[in-house]
């Protein structure tokens, strides 16, 4: 399924089917917390957290695409991400956009 961050897809006309979302919440594990604590002292990228957030974004995108497929969509336009912390040890990621169905001229 085509997913774009733009409002339009060049050369395509479509009808809007509605909003679609994909959500995931990841928890930090004990080992990651130890490594993050050490990095916090010396500075630098916390690669385990970066990997966790990347994986969370991919899961959120796949869930959003699944919802769009269930609506009969051909593509998703205006895709965006939102994220936030839940308590101290959890990170929530949302992918959202507008599901569209291509129409012929």
Curated annotation (Swiss-Prot):
It comes from Ligilactobacillus salivarius (strain UCC118) (Lactobacillus salivarius). It comes from the Bacteria. InterPro entries: UPF0145_dom_sf, UPF0145_YbjQ-like. This is UPF0145 protein LSL_1614. Belongs to the UPF0145 family. Gene3D superfamilies: Hypothetical protein apc22750. Chain B (3.30.110.70). The lineage of its organism: Bacteria, Bacillati, Bacillota, Bacilli, Lactobacillales.
């Amino acid at each position: 399924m085509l997913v774009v961050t733009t409002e339009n897809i060049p050369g395509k006309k479509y009808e809007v089917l509605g909003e679609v979302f994909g959500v995931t919440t990841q928890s930090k594990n004990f080992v990651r917390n130890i490594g993050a604590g050490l990095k916090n002292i010396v500075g630098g990228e916390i690669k385990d957290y970066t990997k966790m957030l990347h994986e969370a974004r991919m899961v959120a995108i796949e869930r959003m695409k699944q919802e769009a497929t269930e609506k009969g969509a051909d593509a998703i336009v205006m895709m965006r991400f939102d994220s936030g912390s839940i308590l101290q040890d959890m990170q929530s990621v949302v992918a959202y956009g507008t599901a569209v169905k291509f129409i012929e001229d």
